[in-house]
């Protein structure tokens, strides 16, 4: 079984959206330590929870933990998802990280266990080592001979290093590949002899001229040294799910691009597990346990929890991080209550990291970070009242008022958000407590029995003068 992966970097400058946790770049730890800073990498407060998450993160990096589960438990707006995102950012791109919401597994196309199985296998990476022969050097000249009758194109490629220079004959496929990569004289390229794939490494420093019109993405590199033909060890990191899809006869590798993978037969997975085990014994591959993050885990039912119990005991199991904001809650699919809405046998297998509500000072720091992320300038008075609102209502509500207040400030041609903008936004948009108060004083809404008292005027108007 041969597996080839092609890494491509694309410029996505046009997509500049600010998400709820886009300001988080890590767990905010001290260098070469597991001690979290008070305010770093977008993380504020929750020192004990971040310290515990740092221990889990270090064990994941060392590869000493697999098949374990961690539960982040705490009230709403206490940074549970933020801690999981911080772990994801700290791991880097080489360790698989799959994020899943508890309600995502309910689908008409996939069974619950199949959706969970795919999520588990997406979170397990296989680092495959492959030795390939490559030709690496600076292009001196490209000659292409085109037939007048429209036949096959032929050509010659002159390529050199600092020690030698060689001329290669080109077929029509290699000529097309050079044209697609826009290779010209002076470029440093790498050619895979087995597949014929051409990789453009950059432009030679010898061709760097002040008057050349070059793009911002042009990279200058040194001309390679030594032999033209070299043998290099290439490392590909793919997930078990990607190998499943590629080897599924009903879907094929095209399903990787469409996303419509469908059900994958257990026989295919067993064959792949056997093959990966052989690669591991031969030293060709290495298993990389990743992380599966399940948010709102209390939305799963007993069938899903039973599957997770079995999957955690498998040889190739990722680290499962779960988050919930429930206390004593009914387990879905049953009539009995349990802590955090999870069955007792699963709770026995998890280590629980608690999170606590933020202090007003921490709320203020988080709101300032969010304002900087959204490029909103807040006046000191506006920041103080937003802090008071966030501490009294919820951090999410206070964070949502930032963009609304910024829009109101732009309407009055102000450069920064002022106190009156926040007050205006607060009067226009209700928080949970004021919404409940309004509902309790109103009789015009449709009740549970489907009836409503229409046409009656409210006795007390809602107070929006705050």
From Swiss-Prot:
Its main location: nucleus. One of its GO terms (biological process) is chromatin remodeling. The keyword Kinase does not apply. GO terms for molecular function: ATP binding; ATP hydrolysis activity; DNA helicase activity. One of its GO terms (cellular component) is Swr1 complex. Pfam families: TIP49, TIP49_C. Keywords: Activator, ATP-binding, Chromatin regulator, DNA damage, DNA repair, Helicase, Hydrolase, Nucleotide-binding, Nucleus, rRNA processing, Transcription, Transcription regulation. It catalyses: ATP + H2O = ADP + phosphate + H(+). PANTHER family: RUVB-RELATED REPTIN AND PONTIN (PTHR11093). This is RuvB-like helicase 2. It comes from Yarrowia lipolytica (strain CLIB 122 / E 150). The gene is RVB2.
